[in-house]
Amino acid sequence: SAVCIPSGQPCPYSKYCCSGSCTYKTNENGNSVQRCD
């Protein structure tokens, strides 16, 4: 009954994203963070 994580939000694994895809992106501080696509 877990709610999926929306696009652009931090994610631990792809399976938790509404889109089913969680990839590394560079944030405004230049750090690499995983976010839902």
Swiss-Prot record:
Primary localisation category: secreted
GO biological process entries: defense response
Gene Ontology MF terms: calcium channel inhibitor activity; toxin activity
Tissue specificity annotation: Expressed by the venom gland.
PROSITE patterns: OMEGA_ACTX_1
Single GO cellular component term: extracellular region
Membrane-crossing segments per the record: none
Family matches, as Pfam families: Omega-toxin
Site (Critical for insecticidal activity): P10, N27, R35
Keywords tagged on the record: Calcium channel impairing toxin, Disulfide bond, Ion channel impairing toxin, Knottin, Neurotoxin, Secreted, Toxin, Voltage-gated calcium channel impairing toxin
InterPro entries, A to Z: Omega-atracotox, Omega-atracotox_CS
Top-level lineage group: Eukaryota
Disulfide bond residue pairs: C4-C18, C11-C22, C17-C36
Keyword match RNA-binding: no
Chain's role: Inhibits insect, but not mammalian, voltage-gated calcium channels (Cav).
Family: Belongs to the neurotoxin 08 (Shiva) family. 01 (omega toxin) subfamily.
Domain comment in the entry: The presence of a 'disulfide through disulfide knot' structurally defines this protein as a knottin.
Protein name: Omega-hexatoxin-Hv1f
Organism for this UniProt entry: Hadronyche versuta
